[in-house]
């Protein structure tokens, strides 16, 4: 999923268990690449075939991703909220596709998944302005994920069911948000990825 507005995020949480309040963004964006034979291809809007909302309320993005040598593979990304919790489940599925233009199912591909995080009220934007030296120290790495605790009482926990987490801190500055630009608001935000 792409980001067009400051209100777009993988997860916007209501941090109060007692009453509704402004949403808080900590898990902003998810960037994904397909890796096959040392060739990476970003899973982006260019590859998007369609989008659907499933009967259970989850959202599914279906991608047709080039893998090299004129071949492709189909990947589905599903995002669902867990009822009653500030929890989002993200899952990937490689579709079983056949045909001369598809990579054979027995040829493995890997996914590189890079989450971008923030710590803000959903009405604001993140500006790095010194956070580059603070946020890396707020991340606790684990074999399959990390905990990001930017302030007491707020922790984002990301855990993968398989694979491994590779620490590789990166800031993306001036992430363009066209909806804010159209409204005459500051169209830029900064995001941090622990790895």
PLM features: what roles do these ranges have?
Residues 1-195:
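Terminal accessory carbohydrate-recognition/targeting modules of carbohydrate-active enzymes
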């Amino acid at each position: 999923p792409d980001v067009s507005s400051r209100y777009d995020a993988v997860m916007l949480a209501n941090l109060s268990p007692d009453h509704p309040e402004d949403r808080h963004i900590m898990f902003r964006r998810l960037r994904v690449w397909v890796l096959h034979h040392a060739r990476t291809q970003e899973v982006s809007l260019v590859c998007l075939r369609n989008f659907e909302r499933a009967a259970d309320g989850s959202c599914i993005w279906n991608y047709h991703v080039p893998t090299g040598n004129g071949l492709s593979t189909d990947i589905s990304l599903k995002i669902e909220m867990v009822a009653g919790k500030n929890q989002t489940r993200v899952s990937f599925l490689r579709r079983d596709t056949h045909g001369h233009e598809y990579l054979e199912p027995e040829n493995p591909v890997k996914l590189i998944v890079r989450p971008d995080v923030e710590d803000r009220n959903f009405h604001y934007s993140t500006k790095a302005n010194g956070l580059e030296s603070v946020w890396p120290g707020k991340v606790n790495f684990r074999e399959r994920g990390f905990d990001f605790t930017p302030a007491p009482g707020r922790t984002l926990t990301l855990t993968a069911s398989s694979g491994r987490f590779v620490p590789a801190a990166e800031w993306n500055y001036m992430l363009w948000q066209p909806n804010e630009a159209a409204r005459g608001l500051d169209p830029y935000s900064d995001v941090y990825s622990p790895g």
